[in-house]
Amino acid sequence: MKDITPDICDQHEDKVTLLNLPLQNFGQKAAFFGEIVTVRCYHDNSKVRDVLSENGKGKVLVVDGHGSCQKALLGDQLAILAIENDWEGVIVFGAVRDVAQMSQMELGIKALGTSPFKTEKRGAGEVNVTLTMHNQMVQPKDYIYADWNGILISKELLQF
């Protein structure tokens, strides 16, 4: 594993902002980056499944679950789907489950916490909308870089 965010900060400090959320690592791939795709949902991961069913080459899904850890928005089945569709990673402002299995998967996964409970499946949620989490904006088509050191956002793809 390679640390990427310190190098990015050293080379591009004026082009990045820190996404200052207390997220934990759950996937085997600890360092990952890509173009941001967003989902906003609450206790319903239908849109997460829809998005992860698409080609995710070079992309990271950022899910705003409103910070709730009552129901998991990502589990092992959706993580497998993400891997099958070439996603770089999934960042969840909410809960995940099946963490023992996901810790063995070659996917970047960060989340606020865990819950053993599954979500509702009502088709609710919004895709590719601007998210605001802890007063910080996350916009689709921006770029996100994540590792053990933190999470950075940039308007452009950075070389490092």
Swiss-Prot record:
Substrate binds at G75, D76, Q77, L78, R97. A divalent metal cation binds at D98. SUPFAM superfamilies: RraA-like. The keyword Ribosomal protein does not apply. Its EC number is 4.1.3.17, 4.1.1.112. It catalyses: 4-hydroxy-4-methyl-2-oxoglutarate = 2 pyruvate; oxaloacetate + H(+) = pyruvate + CO2. GO terms for molecular function: 4-hydroxy-4-methyl-2-oxoglutarate aldolase activity; metal ion binding; oxaloacetate decarboxylase activity; ribonuclease inhibitor activity. Gene3D superfamilies: Ribonuclease E inhibitor RraA/RraA-like. Its cofactor is a divalent metal cation. InterPro entries: RraA (IPR010203), RraA/RraA-like (IPR005493), RraA/RraA-like_sf (IPR036704). CDD domains: RraA_family. Divalent metal cation. It comes from the Bacteria. Catalyzes the aldol cleavage of 4-hydroxy-4-methyl-2-oxoglutarate (HMG) into 2 molecules of pyruvate. Also contains a secondary oxaloacetate (OAA) decarboxylase activity due to the common pyruvate enolate transition state formed following C-C bond cleavage in the retro-aldol and decarboxylation reactions. Belongs to the class II aldolase/RraA-like family. Homotrimer. This is Putative 4-hydroxy-4-methyl-2-oxoglutarate aldolase. The lineage of its organism: Bacteria, Pseudomonadati, Pseudomonadota, Gammaproteobacteria, Vibrionales.
